[in-house]
């Protein structure tokens, strides 16, 4: 058996497709990957976004992200299916170093705890200066003479 490699495929669907059709496309490509021997790790619809440049006369597209694992033989087959589909205007598959990190939503509570801890540290650092620090410094006014200013600059 060959090694299982992690892949991420991002594809863009036409923006004028109905939401039900988008779900059908996602299910279709997920099933195709499973038929070709890949394991689907994650499938996310990223929503409709503005494209950086016009593709097939479209300024927007519906982004879908697939994370999958397989031996690599399934990549050609899934990309061929996307190439033949009129609803897919662009696709890209990249090889990943390893499995994707856990989604941010599951780490939400730990992230909130980190933010509170950072806020506490920031507030402690921003506290007002101590009384003895302010007493040592002499306030300089516009009426101050030049020798006093020079003395302050030197120290």
Curated annotation (Swiss-Prot):
One of its GO terms (cellular component) is ribonucleoprotein complex. It comes from Prochlorococcus marinus (strain MIT 9515). Belongs to the bacterial ribosomal protein bS6 family. This is Small ribosomal subunit protein bS6. Residues 113-141 have a biased composition (Basic and acidic residues). NCBIfam families: S6 (TIGR00166). The keyword RNA-binding applies. Residues 94-155 are annotated as: Disordered.
